[in-house]
Amino acid sequence: MMKVIPLGERLLIKPIKEEKKTEGGIVLPDSAKEKPMKAEVVAVGKIDDDEKFDIKVGDKVIYSKYAGTEIKIDDEDYIIIDVNDILAKIEE
């Protein structure tokens, strides 16, 4: 895999795709689904205030719906996103 390192206060995230079904059990195609807003952090750029920023590689996050720049790496979808567009960290 090509290594992508985000510059500045940005993250490289991989959207978590969830299979969507209707109540009747019909699987919806990607074009009919709402854009996912959950992702896994793949890489972290240089964060100025590391002590207040508690997100690291492997964490799952919720991000703003239309934020970031979508890119493809080895036929996989990723997003480069500003840290301010991360809304929450998911703890399981």
Curated annotation (Swiss-Prot):
GO terms for cellular component: cytoplasm. Pfam families: Cpn10 (PF00166). One of its GO terms (biological process) is chaperone cofactor-dependent protein refolding. InterPro entries: Chaperonin_GroES (IPR020818), Chaperonin_GroES_sf (IPR037124), Chaprnonin_Cpn10_CS (IPR018369), GroES-like_sf (IPR011032). Keywords: Chaperone, Cytoplasm. PROSITE patterns: CHAPERONINS_CPN10. SMART domains: Cpn10. It is found in: Cytoplasm. GO terms for molecular function: ATP binding; metal ion binding; protein folding chaperone; protein-folding chaperone binding; unfolded protein binding. HAMAP family: CH10. Together with the chaperonin GroEL, plays an essential role in assisting protein folding. The GroEL-GroES system forms a nano-cage that allows encapsulation of the non-native substrate proteins and provides a physical environment optimized to promote and accelerate protein folding. GroES binds to the apical surface of the GroEL ring, thereby capping the opening of the GroEL channel. Heptamer of 7 subunits arranged in a ring. Interacts with the chaperonin GroEL. Belongs to the GroES chaperonin family. This is Co-chaperonin GroES. It comes from Thermotoga maritima (strain ATCC 43589 / DSM 3109 / JCM 10099 / NBRC 100826 / MSB8).
